Regions:
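Bacterial Sec-dependent N-terminal signal peptides
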Residues: 1-30
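A generic structural micro-environment signature
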Residues: 7, 15, 61-66, 176, ...
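Oxidative protein folding and maturation machinery
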Residues: 27-172, 177-178
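Short amphipathic alpha-helical segments with coiled-coil-like heptad repeat character
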Residues: 2-4, 120, 181
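Short active-site neighborhood of thiol/selenol oxidoreductases, capturing the structured segment around
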Residues: 183-206
Length: 208
């Protein structure tokens, strides 16, 4: 599944649903948001409910719905934005609820695997968020019936995207200074180091 359209913009409907006592109903061409109970008063409780029940009204078996970018793709964009606002436990529970439903059918699984890659793995995505991606990957890894190859692939991605997250100790690696001399980050344990990361194939980057 290719995504050639511009990245959708995150909407404010989710925060509205968390903060106000509103009921969001499914309408034609709109994502079928869950109804957040008015008895849930705090933003934390509303956020938790919305995350876990976000996909309750979505029909993962509908091919036409899966192909509707205004509904499915934008709904997924809003969901990953929602995950980024949660504590780790709530995010994991919400991701588990999503994966259980989304990966029960092959077409749905293929659609959301592609969307996850497009928005959370693509370096050009303004929504790229390794921490959120790892939450989803771990939920995918907990699924039953995975082949050894699928497990290995998910394990590799979890290790890769789970490294050097905010708040973690940076993994040791080699870098080259402006004179072409090679160093390791561990050589500067008690010093501050300013590193410039760039694409080796980017000609303009080499000129900076």
């Amino acid at each position: 599944m290719k995504h050639n359209t511009p990245f959708p913009i995150r909407l404010g409907l989710l925060l509205l649903a968390m903060m106000a006592s509103v009921v969001l109903h499914a309408q034609g061409g709109q994502f079928p948001f869950p109804s957040v109970p008015s008895t849930l008063r705090t933003p934390e409780d509303r956020l938790q409910y919305l995350g876990i029940h976000y996909w309750d009204r979505f029909d993962f078996r509908s091919q036409s719905l899966l192909a509707d970018k205004d509904v499915t793709e934008q709904g997924f964009v809003n969901f990953i934005d929602l995950l980024s606002r949660m504590d780790s436990l709530t995010a994991a529970r919400s991701a588990d609820a999503f994966v259980t439903k989304a990966f029960a059918q092959k077409q749905s699984a293929d659609t959301f695997t592609s969307l996850s890659h497009h928005y959370l793995e693509n370096p050009q995505s303004p929504l790229r968020n390794d921490a959120v991606y790892v939450v989803l990957l771990r939920s995918m890894r907990r699924r039953k019936g995975l082949t050894p190859t699928q497990r290995q692939g998910l394990d590799y991605k979890i290790r890769t995207f789970g490294s050097n997250l905010p708040g973690q100790r940076a993994a040791d690696f080699q870098f080259v200074d402006r004179r072409g001399k090679h160093h390791r980050l561990s050589d500067y344990r008690h010093e501050r180091v300013l590193l410039f990361f760039y694409d080796p194939d980017c000609d303009n980057c080499h000129r900076i």
